[in-house]
Amino acid sequence: MRPTSVIRIDLASIDANIRAVRRLVGPACRLCPIVKADAYGLGARRIARRLAPASHLLAVYSPMQAVELLEHRVSAPSLFLMPVDSLARGDELYRALLGGGVHLT
């Protein structure tokens, strides 16, 4: 029987890929990589940190996914893919929305 499978993420390849995309689309195009669902199981925090410097926004599905990125000081603002009906004024996400750190679809 084989042991549990392992996925190794090559962060240098992520850097190279985002640079290649940037070269193809040019500096005027705004990039918004999707890091929802824990970056599809690859680890949203570390993937988001690598993508953030070259991205205008990082797309997440839910408010909780955005909170995770905010708590870990990921520099790019988040774009919610999930419809959001309301945010409480005292909520961290409400403050981030006012400050441009969160965007709604």
Predicted regions mapped to residue ranges:
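Gly-rich Lys/Arg/Thr-decorated short loops/hinges at beta-loop-alpha junctions or inter-strand turns
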Residues: 1-3
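Active-site-proximal beta-alpha core segment in soluble small-molecule metabolic enzymes
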Residues: 5-8, 15-16, 27-105
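Conserved PLP-enzyme active-site core in the AAT-like
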Residues: 24
